[in-house]
Amino acid sequence: MDKNGIIQYLLDKCLVAIVRASSGDDLVRVVEAVAEGGVPCVEVTMTTPGALACIETASKKLAGSYALIGVGTVLDAETCRAAILAGAEYIVTPTLSLPVIQMARRYGKPVFSGAFTPTEILTAWEAGTDFAKVFPCSVVGPEYIKAI
């Protein structure tokens, strides 16, 4: 699926399970169970040990299914590239990282850039992010989003 197809799929499905586990083996089982349970998009966070191996294994096992595997908590371009090469179809960052946006664009993958201030949101957009994820939004609530 190309980048526009991935974006449309994410927008159409509107459900992403963010998964974490205490080990890579557990993580693979969680990803498979979530996908087999009908969740169309699964985000594997880089905070879990063995996340890259999990992405690679899950991407191969679920190839051809409706499940879309992405990666979250991406902090640098090297991790972004490694995750894409392992099979991640989309990238999520908790912070604004211009090198991550550039790497995702180089590989034709959608990127959700973490941003908090209006300046960060605009900077992410101008750098080519596909989505700005206001993070951490829970500390300011919906009125902040409305004001922006």
Regions found by a protein language model. Give the residues of each.
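Conserved N-terminal beta1-alpha1 strand-loop-helix module at the mouth
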Residues: 1-86, 106
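Conserved anion-binding
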Residues: 50, 65-66, 75-78, 84-148
